[in-house]
């Protein structure tokens, strides 16, 4: 936002220097990013009169001039052609330094002496471009600095506004901030419109078909205008804020835009079919040519302004070529409307068309200032273009927008800011900001927010206003205060930490992957079409299709991480993730979010070394990880079975984990097709445990059994057992006898081959016996051992070898 010092002083009285004003604005949160002084240091550029002009003897395009500055007559060589004898001009005398650090010196030009320079607006920094030198009003006194004589000395501030401060996109808005800080009032211009006897209802009609996108539309009709150049004061003021002059009518709309911050648009009323304005959405594929000469293809989401036959403007963004103000324009329909910010933002972004108008509408305009801005523009057009304003204003406002009221607590504000202001002091701040304070209780307010402050929505926004107006530099330095909670972690939290420690202790690294996945990735996992994990939760606004649904398994994320690392030649990996998955819940809108532990192992078992053989990890490595977890959680009576397995496991190389009737999880080698689907060319082993079920069956009380100080003894049993019988059932059968003297039973040999019948396998079990009371002797161990043998033969139909 660009604003000038003098323009601000028209709306608020202050005695601050430009530098002091710059500091004040910055402390208010309106950061001044640049300051430019106009006319400063140009006192040597004075008003002079051309007494004589003649042709340069040595150059066709140069003139010899005799110029009087009120003290003396000087010889000047000039190349401009737009002046004559008797004109008053801006004379840069010897020693003057013009913008761009251009110093005026006595010189000879084509053999003729020149004691100064006649200046153009561009050379004085008054315009970006100019033709010829500046011709001054005839009533200006000679010898007076030009900028003093014209009242052009000014300071231009370039202010960087945050997107929420739409109220400061105007001179009035910034003046309101200055007045609030200084405790003074804004001198609002109350436009007075001299109306003709012709009612506007006889000249124009407005129909709003979509009041959601255009809640309010106002208009005035001005007849008999003469289109021409704007007066110098208006041109210079627009140029000071970075706008170029077009004609007196368009310049007025731009002037009011910068003054009040509300966009206006002027239509050539004679080009509006039927004298009608219709506000409605565009038709899909509709083509419309805007003022910049570009043809735009519109959609049904774009709001247009139409007459009785065609589109004449892209609402809130840019007018149309077919209704613009021309040199021949006589009658004008002036628009002042409020458009839905989201609709303007969407259309502007889609078309790549950003204008001063759309910049303000998409941030939120002031719906209450429409008529004020409209009347201000109408009175200026009548003054500068000689128009006659029709009686009355069209104001279509079927459903007034609701007012915002925000509850405010004085003690909460003091606590958050670390200050000690009274309720009266805070109320005074809000009153200076033109907020209405309704006192509910001595330290409880209901604040009515002005329509211009679209950024005020919650109590914390009001707290910020107190901080700004009271001064950030007035907030005392205090140590931060926070409540310290000493609650102990819950059982689940302790178990989560324990599980992470177990995994890290076994050489795993924790990874964190996205909670989103691509729906098509479930096909890569070979899941059946009726698998519940295909019932995914879809995101309403995904960034990309690859992250458009919530994950129902942790496996894809781990495989993506593994594939990426393997591509970088990190061939040995142990990774785990303890995170939630999102599974459908029958009869409920929201999914279940169980916590799962998933891990993968691939590569070699041990790091390479001269004393280590290079063995690849296998099924028993991942099984060992599972057993270690079960031991840490004190979970007994676990059975490993080769059923209830997911299709992404390799057949015959995976197990499910059962504890009673609860399925705790599964583990094993992944199917070769899974490797191919994820671009992995080595075996990967996977484990998946349901943390909630682990926690449910785990025990917090672990029985401590002191070691026996007596020696053990062992006996071996070699037996034949059917192939389909898991070897683990032998150990389970022995444990089920609950013989106190049996310390452990371990399988130490597994054999299939010669001397073993087809359909059988040879298993050898070593049973260790030990007593805590004495050393066991053979006649005590033998009957115990025989009991075990008999039970195995009877229950498992084994053949003792």
UniProtKB/Swiss-Prot annotation:
GO molecular function, one term: tRNA binding
Subcellular location: Cytoplasm
Binding residues for Mg(2+): 455, 461, 464-465
Keywords: Aminoacyl-tRNA synthetase, ATP-binding, Cytoplasm, Ligase, Magnesium, Metal-binding, Nucleotide-binding, Protein biosynthesis, RNA-binding, tRNA-binding
One Pfam family recorded for the sequence: B5
Cofactor: Mg(2+)
GO process annotations (BP): phenylalanyl-tRNA aminoacylation
Broadest EC class assigned to this enzyme: ligase
Gene3D superfamilies: 3.30.56.10, Bira Bifunctional Protein, Domain 2, Ferrodoxin-fold anticodon-binding domain, Nucleic acid-binding proteins, Phenylalanyl-trna Synthetase, Chain B, domain 3
Subunit relationships: Tetramer of two alpha and two beta subunits.
Similarity comment: family membership: Belongs to the phenylalanyl-tRNA synthetase beta subunit family. Type 1 subfamily.
Protein name: Phenylalanine--tRNA ligase beta subunit
């Amino acid at each position: 936002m660009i604003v000038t010092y003098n323009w601000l002083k028209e709306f608020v009285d202050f005695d601050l220097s430009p530098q002091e004003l710059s500091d004040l604005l910055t402390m208010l949160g309106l950061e001044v990013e640049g300051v430019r002084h106009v006319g400063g240091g140009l006192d040597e550029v004075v008003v002079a009169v051309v007494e004589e002009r003649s042709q340069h003897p040595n150059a066709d395009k140069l003139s010899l001039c005799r110029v009087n500055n009120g003290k003396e007559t000087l010889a000047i060589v000039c190349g401009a052609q737009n002046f004559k004898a008797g004109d008053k001009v801006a004379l840069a005398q010897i020693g003057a330094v013009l913008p761009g650090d251009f110093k005026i010196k006595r010189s000879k030009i084509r053999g003729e002496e020149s004691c100064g320079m006649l200046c153009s607006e561009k050379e004085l920094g008054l315009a970006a471009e100019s033709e010829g030198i500046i011709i001054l009003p005839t009533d200006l006194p000679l010898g007076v600095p030009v900028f003093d004589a014209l009242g052009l000395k000014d300071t231009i501030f370039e202010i960087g506004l945050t997107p929420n401060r739409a109220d400061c996109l105007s001179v009035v808005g910034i003046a309101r901030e200055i007045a609030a800080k200084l405790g003074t009032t804004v001198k609002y211009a109350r436009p007075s419109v001299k109306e003709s006897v012709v009612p506007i209802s006889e000249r124009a009609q407005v129909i709003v078909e979509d009041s959601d996108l255009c809640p309010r539309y106002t208009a005035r009709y001005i007849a008999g205008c003469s289109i021409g150049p704007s007066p110098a004061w208006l041109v210079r003021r627009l140029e000071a804020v970075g706008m170029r002059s077009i004609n007196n009518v368009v310049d007025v709309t731009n002037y009011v835009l910068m003054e009040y911050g509300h966009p206006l648009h002027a239509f050539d009323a004679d080009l509006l079919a039927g004298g009608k304005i219709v506000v409605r959405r565009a038709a899909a594929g509709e083509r419309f040519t805007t003022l910049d000469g570009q043809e735009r293809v519109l959609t049904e989401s774009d709001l247009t302004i139409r007459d009785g036959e065609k589109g004449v403007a892209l609402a809130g963004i840019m007018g149309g070529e077919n209704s613009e103000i021309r040199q021949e324009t006589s009658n004008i329909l002036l628009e002042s409307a409020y458009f839905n910010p989201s609709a303007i933002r969407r259309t502007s972004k889609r078309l790549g068309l950003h204008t001063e108008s759309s910049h303000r509408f998409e941030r939120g305009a002031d719906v209450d200032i429409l008529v004020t801005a409209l009347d201000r523009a109408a009175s200026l057009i009548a003054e500068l273009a000689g128009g006659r304003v029709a009686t009355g204003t069209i104001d279509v406002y079927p459903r007034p927008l609701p007012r915002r009221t925000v509850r405010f607590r004085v003690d909460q504000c003091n606590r958050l800011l670390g200050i000690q202001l009274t309720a009266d002091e805070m109320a005074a701040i809000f009153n200076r900001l033109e907020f209405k304070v309704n006192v509910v209780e001595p330290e409880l307010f209901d604040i009515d927010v002005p329509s211009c402050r679209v950024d005020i929505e919650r109590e914390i926004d009001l707290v910020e206003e107190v901080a700004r107006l009271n001064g950030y530099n007035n907030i005392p330095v205090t140590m931060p205060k926070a409540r310290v909670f000493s609650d102990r972690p819950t059982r689940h939290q302790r178990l989560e930490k324990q599980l992470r420690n177990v995994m890290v202790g076994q050489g795993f690294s924790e990874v964190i992957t996205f909670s989103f996945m691509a729906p098509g990735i479930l096909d890569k996992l070979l899941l059946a079409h009726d698998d519940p994990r295909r019932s995914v939760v879809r995101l309403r606004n995904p960034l990309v299709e690859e992250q458009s649904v919530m994950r129902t398994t942790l496996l894809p994320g781990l495989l993506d991480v593994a594939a990426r690392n393997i591509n970088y030649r990190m061939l040995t990996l142990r990774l785990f993730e303890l995170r939630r998955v999102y599974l459908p819940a029958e009869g409920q809108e929201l999914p279940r979010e169980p916590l799962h532990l998933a891990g993968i192992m691939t590569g070699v078992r041990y790091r390479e070394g001269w004393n280590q053989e290079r063995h690849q990890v296998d099924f028993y490595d991942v099984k060992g990880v599972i057993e270690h977890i079960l031991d840490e959680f004190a979970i007994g009576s676990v059975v490993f079975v080769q059923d209830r397995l997911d299709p992404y496991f390799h057949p015959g190389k995976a197990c499910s984990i059962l504890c009673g009737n609860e399925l705790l999880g599964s583990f094993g080698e992944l199917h070769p097709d899974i490797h191919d689907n994820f671009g992995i060319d080595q075996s990967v082993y996977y484990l998946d445990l349901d943390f909630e079920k682990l926690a449910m069956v785990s025990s917090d009380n672990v029985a401590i059994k002191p070691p026996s100080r007596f020696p053990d003894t062992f006996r071996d049993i070699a037996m034949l057992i059917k192939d389909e019988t898991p070897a683990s059932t032998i150990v389970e059968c022995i444990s089920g006898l609950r013989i106190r003297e049996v310390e452990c039973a371990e399988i130490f040999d597994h054999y299939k081959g010669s001397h073993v019948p087809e359909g059988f396998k040879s298993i050898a079990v070593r049973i260790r016996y030990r007593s805590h009371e004495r050393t066991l002797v053979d006649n005590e161990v033998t009957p115990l051992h025989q009991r075990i043998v008999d039970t195995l033969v009877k229950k498992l139909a084994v053949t003792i070898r």
